[in-house]
Amino acid sequence: MSPSTGVELYLDLLKRTVSNFIYQDATHVAGLITEAAFVEEARESGEDYPTVAHTMIGMKRLNNLQHCVESALRDGVPGDVLETGVWRGGACIFARGILKAYDVRDRTVWVADSFQGFPKITDDDHPMDAEMNLHQYNEAVDLPTSLATVQRNFSRYGLLDDQVRFLPGWFKDTMPTAPFERLAVLRMDGDSYGATMDVLTHAYPRLSPGGFAIIDDYCIPACREAVHEYRDRHGISDEIVEIDRQGVYWRRSA
């Protein structure tokens, strides 16, 4: 059924805009992608590297983010929204738009990123991260996006205000002292074992019961390893639900 209310129409259009289903920009050529073209199925599933769009997570994961935020609001789950790994900011822009659409004034969207792309590999990194060496993809898919650029993107949507706060830096440095108290939605998009584990270790304990943990890169073995290692260590048995071929989420029961 098509959207009908003003809120539904706004959020549907906002999703289409941050993912650029409107003007349908081509993808970067990288990895398994050999042609610079817009492919609707790939954009729907977040399986391309947009040249212009403000998010690469695709429509299915945007729908999931909307489901999680709206469910938290409906059920009165206390806390803010945090995304770790934001690229051009599109998913966080959409999250702020959801709060705006429902006139929610007591929650914050936290935008955490290095704003430098992936870090260089060091001797301290997990072996699976060293093998992937994600740093090599920074330029190929235009990953490094400055804080100023992300802030400007928020401003273009009319959504840069005091309910948006930025946490620039590597997660191992920013997460231990991040100033949020409670989270209703925790969206992790760091790709690597290290980034995922840093966020789970320091942010997941602040996720409220009934809140949502979203893992954008569960399809990546290093990320999946961190997720299961953390869940096993802390006895987390909440059902992992598949979003698409890449992402999953679960709802925290306790």
UniProtKB/Swiss-Prot annotation:
- Report keywords, A-Z: Antibiotic biosynthesis, Magnesium, Metal-binding, Methyltransferase, S-adenosyl-L-methionine, Transferase
User: Record-annotated residues binding S-adenosyl-L-methionine?
Assistant: 55-56, 83-87, 113-117, 171, 189-190
Please list the disulfide bridges.
none
Gene Ontology molecular function terms on file: magnesium ion binding; O-methyltransferase activity; small molecule binding
Pathway, per record: Antibiotic biosynthesis; mycinamicin biosynthesis
* EC number(s) on file: 2.1.1.237
Q: Which InterPro entries match?
A: SAM-dependent_MTases_sf, TylF_MeTrfase
Say what happens when this gene is deleted: No production of mycinamicin II and accumulation of mycinamicin III.
Q: Which GO terms describe its biological process?
A: antibiotic biosynthetic process; methylation
Q: Where does Mg(2+) bind?
A: 189, 216-217
Q: Name the cofactor(s) required for activity, per the record.
A: Mg(2+)
The reactions it catalyses are:
mycinamicin III + S-adenosyl-L-methionine = mycinamicin IV + S-adenosyl-L-homocysteine + H(+)
What does this gene product do? O-methyltransferase that catalyzes the conversion of mycinamicin III to mycinamicin IV in the biosynthesis of mycinamicin, a 16-membered macrolide antibiotic.
Per the record, the similarity remark reads: Belongs to the methyltransferase TylF/MycF family.
Q: What is this protein called?
A: Mycinamicin III 3''-O-methyltransferase
Species the sequence originates in: Micromonospora griseorubida
The major lineage groups are:
Bacteria, Bacillati, Actinomycetota, Actinomycetes, Micromonosporales
